[in-house]
C-alpha cells in the first residue's frame, strides 16, 4: 500500500500548485488558450500512459501521473470559473451547488466507467489469447485493459479539444444574437 501512496503524492502536490497557476493564467490569457493548451498536454501525457507495462517502474508512473495532473490543474479551475461566469450573479449560489453536484457525480461515474472498460477489454484479451502461462495471461490482459482505458481517455480529450474550439466569448455570443 505504501508504494501507491508514494505514486499519488507528487501528482497531488502538482495538482494543487498548478490549479493556482491555472487560475492566474485564466485571468492573464483567457479561458480558450489555456484549456486548449492543457488538453494538448493531457492528450500527450495520456498517450504516454499507453506505453506502461508490468515493467514500468513506480517512479516512471509517478512522473507520468504528476505530468497528467499539470494538465488537469491548468484546466479544472478555469473550467469551473467559466461555467459559473455563465450564470447570472443572483443565481451564483445555485450555479455553484449544481457545479459541485455535477463534479461529484462525474467523479463517481468516471472511475466506474473506466473500470468497466478495463474489465471488458481484459476479458476480451483473455478470450482472444492463446497464452498458456496463466500468470503471463493475467498480466497481459490487465495491461491491455489499462491501455484501452487510456485510449478512451484520449478520445474524450480530443472531443473536449474540438468542443473547446467552438466556444465563444460572452460578448461574441451577444453580438450574434
Please give the residue ranges for each predicted region.
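Short, membrane-exposed interhelical loops at transmembrane-helix boundaries
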Residues: 129-145
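Short, polar/charged, Gly/Pro-enriched helix-capping and turn/loop motifs at alpha-helix termini
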Residues: 124-127, 172-173
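12-transmembrane solute porter fold
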Residues: 1-124, 144-167
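Intrinsic disorder in cytosolic terminal tails and internal cytosolic loops
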Residues: 134-137, 167-177
Amino acid at each position: 500500500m505504501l508504494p501507491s501512496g508514494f505514486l499519488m503524492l507528487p501528482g497531488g502536490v502538482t495538482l494543487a500548485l498548478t490549479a493556482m497557476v491555472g487560475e492566474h493564467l485564466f485571468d492573464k490569457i483567457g479561458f480558450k488558450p489555456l484549456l486548449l493548451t492543457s488538453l494538448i498536454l493531457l492528450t500527450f501525457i495520456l498517450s504516454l500512459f499507453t506505453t506502461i507495462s508490468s515493467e514500468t517502474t513506480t517512479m516512471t508512473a509517478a512522473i507520468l501521473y504528476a505530468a497528467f495532473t499539470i494538465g488537469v490543474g491548468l484546466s479544472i479551475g478555469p473550467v469551473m470559473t467559466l461555467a459559473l461566469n455563465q450564470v447570472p450573479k443572483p443565481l451564483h449560489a445555485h450555479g455553484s451547488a449544481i457545479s459541485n453536484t455535477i463534479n461529484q457525480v462525474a467523479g463517481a461515474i468516471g472511475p466506474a466507467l473506466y473500470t468497466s472498460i478495463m474489465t471488458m477489454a481484459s476479458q476480451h484479451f483473455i478470450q482472444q489469447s492463446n497464452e498458456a502461462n496463466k500468470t503471463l495471461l493475467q498480466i497481459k490482459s490487465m495491461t491491455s485493459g489499462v491501455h484501452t482505458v487510456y485510449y478512451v481517455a484520449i478520445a474524450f480529450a480530443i472531443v473536449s479539444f474540438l468542443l473547446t474550439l467552438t466556444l465563444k466569448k460572452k460578448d461574441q455570443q451577444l453580438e450574434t444574437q
